[in-house]
């Protein structure tokens, strides 16, 4: 099969207006860059192509600088614009996972609207991905491995080389006299993917010549079965998930465990989260969904937190504890912590008007020091005709989830609470 003509056919079906090539400088991505450069030269026979490349400098290898320089030379040769992005790798969950997370987050910054990320994954990579999913005990979703087009980390991804083997890419590279770099870490069999690539899969291919194609068929069967399950559950799923980061639990407890886990996996997939293990899903169901009514349960899943409130699950990021945070308001704008944005103040003859996000509150002027705090316990008078009430009850009446209550800016005049911006103000007792 001819690489160039095959990719040309694939591009005719692509809806993107631009393509951002993930370029490591290795064999696979160098072949990919060369193919797209050729397609750009054939533009009179194609819709105009907008092609850029991006190289992620992880800083993990002593050769990282030379790899970046090599990629720049390649792109100069092919007249394709290149972005070089340096990243810091968080090794908490392992170098592989940290590098992958850093890489995709960096790429996401540069990916433009109507542009697809193009990666050089090929058939041999597909087999490795399938085996890694098998090792983790993955279900249909994980065993579906990689698709030619998908969404990952919220980005559209195009993998035009999935139907080709590594030897086919090597043949093309030699014919085109391409130069590429070699990552020395690829020989380190302490990494699972390298162990499979260097030790296990060569023996399987030696025994069964078409082993990779058979794995690809199995992965496709898994994908089709998962799609069928999603189709059969789509109407029920829509009833539970009308807002992307919220999952309603009404009737959920009446379903079988298999149906519950399938619906939860659909919700997590909709939010582009990696699939949890069966043990994690069972823990989520038992410890969060079936927790006591008055509980405030939560479940950490990678860099997200699943919380329950009023018979719904909510997906949020992890939040910092702000209850001990006190900020003095000395200017007309205050930068709030933990990505809460800015609080601004405008004044007229008698009043101060506080703005935060889409909310505002008007308070009388004061000579007392003004501060912003988060979290409060006690009774307040939030309505002129009602007695003082416990603030917890007020939050409940306003249907504010517990984790949001300590993230709403509270305005204090001296040590007296005056307002929760956008939710209530405190009235004096006469």
From Swiss-Prot:
NCBIfam families: lysidine_TilS_C, lysidine_TilS_N
Catalyzed reaction equations: cytidine(34) in tRNA(Ile2) + L-lysine + ATP = lysidine(34) in tRNA(Ile2) + AMP + diphosphate + H(+)
Molecular function via GO: ATP binding; tRNA(Ile)-lysidine synthase activity
Functional summary from the UniProt entry: Ligates lysine onto the cytidine present at position 34 of the AUA codon-specific tRNA(Ile) that contains the anticodon CAU, in an ATP-dependent manner. Cytidine is converted to lysidine, thus changing the amino acid specificity of the tRNA from methionine to isoleucine.
Membrane-crossing residue ranges in chain numbering: none
GO cellular component, one term: cytoplasm
Family label: Belongs to the tRNA(Ile)-lysidine synthase family.
Domain notes: The N-terminal region contains the highly conserved SGGXDS motif, predicted to be a P-loop motif involved in ATP binding.
Name of protein: tRNA(Ile)-lysidine synthase
Binding site for ATP: 24-29
